[in-house]
Amino acid sequence: MNEILFFSPQPLFSHMMNENSRVHTHSNLRHIFFSEIGIGISGNSFLLLFHILKFIHGHRSRLSDLPIGLLSLIHLLMLLVMAFIATDIFISWRGWDDIICKFLVYLYRVLRGLSLCTTSMLSVLQAIILSPRSSCLAKFKRKSLHHISCAILFLSVLYMLIGSQLLVSIIATPNLTTNDFIYVTQSCSILPLSYVMQSMFSTLLVIRDVFLISLMVLSTWYMVALLCRHRKKTQHLQGISLSPKTSPKQRATQTLLMLMSFFVLMTIYDTIVSCSRTMFLNDPTSYNMQIFVVHIYATVSPFVFMSTEKHIVNCLRSV
């Protein structure tokens, strides 16, 4: 009996240490995530305001201005919705009903889909802008913005239809302990659908992601090839010993290439982790890490786009 009393505190102490470590990690993730959300909301608000003022004052706009302004609006709304959802992830309210859960999660997933569609179309548009006059893409320059806008609208409606299964599967977390539900927030969970329905919707989402990412990869590869060809031609004309200056259009393209590459990696990471959570792992800590990582693009992108705007750069340098 004495041996039992002597050794029994050890598992309890270990459990308390693990629990304290988990709470500490959760608290750190909460502070980091809300800081990320705050920075992203500020950056996208500033970028959106810049494009609105640019339009009101009648400045000459580029073909990419409308998609970039639309992307900043989408990211602003997405981060605002995510900030509201995150309060129920990191702060245990458990006060949402089915309607609130369905509305917020579905709206967030639609905005995520719009972000993917707009980013992909922006990559294609930049490839069209950069294409030389002799290219077969040159004929799309005049009507490219109209085509891109129609494509974004079509893909958005298509994704809203595909994502409508969330209106059925998202429910308020019941007051019972079960491993069948997939964690979303403290108040909301995903009710697993039948194997056939889950496979069908997952296949449609994978097809959509593969199609849009393939467009981004192809347009990125095309832009890299054009930049390399232009650089070789410039070096041949000016001499290899001289380093040719990069034009503003090329600098903007190079910046966009880095941003697109990062976005593709984040999308692939999100897809892999989401599938693993659905099939194998339902761990809230890994889920919190996932939502932090996948929002880096929405947080960083407005500052990257602003770095290519000469008016903003000159204004900041004069301060």
Swiss-Prot record:
It is a multi-pass membrane protein. Residues 1-31, 87-109, 172-203, 276-285 are extracellular. One of its GO terms (cellular component) is plasma membrane. Residues 53-65, 131-150, 225-254, 307-319 are cytoplasmic. Expressed in a subset of sensory neurons located in the apical layer of the vomeronasal organ. GO terms for biological process: response to pheromone; sensory perception of chemical stimulus. SUPFAM superfamilies: Family A G protein-coupled receptor-like (SSF81321). Disulfide bonds join 101-188. Keywords: Cell membrane, Disulfide bond, G-protein coupled receptor, Glycoprotein, Membrane, Pheromone response, Receptor, Transducer, Transmembrane, Transmembrane helix. It is found in: Cell membrane. Belongs to the G-protein coupled receptor 1 family. This is Vomeronasal type-1 receptor 51. It comes from Mus musculus (Mouse). The gene is Vmn1r51.
